[in-house]
A protein has these predicted regions:
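OB-fold and OB-like single-stranded nucleic-acid-recognition modules
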Residues: 1-170
Length: 170
């Protein structure tokens, strides 16, 4: 996961300016298990959608009856029932919460159409963000690990490519 350019990506809004520093190229494929939209505050302007994506056994329909997924203010939650063929460590290593920063309007529109259990492929960059919003300094950093948990373990994902089932958006 390396990125050949140190060129920052700038996003400007009426009340803020944000600089994203690319850290790594990133690709994730799986099924979307939960989606949450945001519109208020500075983070909702930059990253209007969070997608929880799962792969491996978690993407198999026969396991849906054992696991439920949800999201709340930038956090991803799951519960599994007794008899589940997967355990806590498997869920952690086979799912992720992605804070989506659409590269353009077409990507944003595509992300909004993703439905639960859609098979998706997303490509782009993991970024750290710094900026100002309404005169306040803000920062937001991505995770670069697939094994971390808790606060700071989500991917801050600048998305440049979306495939939903067989449809491609760039």
């Amino acid at each position: 996961m390396s990125y050949a350019s140190d060129q920052p990506i700038i996003k400007e809004f009426r009340s803020g300016r944000f600089t994203m520093i690319p850290l790594a190229e990133y690709k994730i494929s799986g099924v979307m298990v939960s989606k949450k939209t945001y519109s208020s505050n500075w983070d909702g302007k930059v990253s209007p959608i969070d997608l929880a994506i799962a792969w491996g056994k978690l993407a198999e329909p026969e396991n849906d009856r054992y696991i439920t997924y949800s999201q709340g203010y930038r956090w991803y939650h799951y519960k599994w029932r007794e008899g589940s063929p997967v355990d806590h460590s498997y869920v952690i290593s086979h799912s992720s919460n992605n804070h989506i920063i659409p590269a353009n309007e077409n990507i944003y529109r595509a992300i909004k159409t993703i439905k639960t259990k859609d098979r998706v492929v997303l490509k782009g960059l993991l970024v750290n963000l710094k900026g100002t919003y309404k005169g306040q300094t803000v920062t937001w950093n991505t995770s670069l690990s697939r094994t971390d948990t808790g606060n700071g373990s989500c991917e801050l994902f600048y998305v440049t490519y979306v495939r939903i089932e067989t449809k491609i958006y760039e």
